Structure formats: C-alpha cells, structure tokens
Amino acid sequence: MNRFKSIGWLLTSFVTILSGSTLAAHHEALQPVAQPGQVIVTYRGACPNEAIDKAITLIKETIAYERKNSPILYSSSPGVWSDGRIGAVDLHESQEAMEKAFAWQVADDKWSSMYEEIASSCGITIEDFEVDSLDSR
C-alpha cells in the first residue's frame, strides 16, 4: 500500500510541476503586435449593420488582391470594431514601406476601385474612412 501511495504522490508531484511549467509558458506564444520601427495602420468606416457582412467580404477580397499584386509586402486583417464600424489593421515593416504601399494603392486602379466599392457598400465614400497610423517603438 505504501508503494502505491509513493507512486501516487510521485505522479501528483510530476503532473503539478508539468502543469505549472505549461501554464507559465502560455504567454510565450504571444509576440508583440509590432516590433520597433514597424507601423500599424487602422482603417475605420461607418457601415449599416445589414451591410457589414458584404463589406467584410469585399475587404477580404481586397486584401487577397493586395497579397497577390502589391510589390510591397505587408500584413492586413479585416474586422468589425467594437463600435460597429468596419475596417482593417495593416502592419508595415517601416514608415518607408508604408509610404510605398500607399503609393502603390493610389496608382493601382483595381485596388482603388475595390476600396471605393467597400465604401459604397456601406453608403459612404473613401474620404469617410478614418485612417490612423501608429509608429511602434
């Protein structure tokens, strides 16, 4: 019987130590949103509730187009803000890379028309979008 108590105590101790290590490491998978020097850009636009799903679909199509056609690599994720506005968050490697991406967007007729279609689907214009940037430090 003592042998089973010893094995039980040993197993309990082992599991406790492992679970503590596992729980302590759960934050290691999370990385900072941006590294110093990178730039985060947010887009926010009002959109009626009934138009949100279509607008998000259009944003996803625009992001797919960017990934395939933009000569400047950057990451973008679409979504709905807590206040119900639609938009996206982009991550650029630097201020210079962001400016090059913006220049490509303006020069690319298809991208520009896709952005206008997103705005139009919500009954707004592209000028109505709030675009803000954050320089990560």
Regions found by a protein language model. Give the residues of each.
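Short S/T/G/P-rich N-terminal loop/turn motif that feeds into the first structured element of a domain
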Residues: 20-110, 119-137
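Bacterial N-terminal signal peptides that target proteins for export
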Residues: 1-11
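Bacterial N-terminal signal peptides
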Residues: 9-19
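Non-heme di-metal
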Residues: 114-115
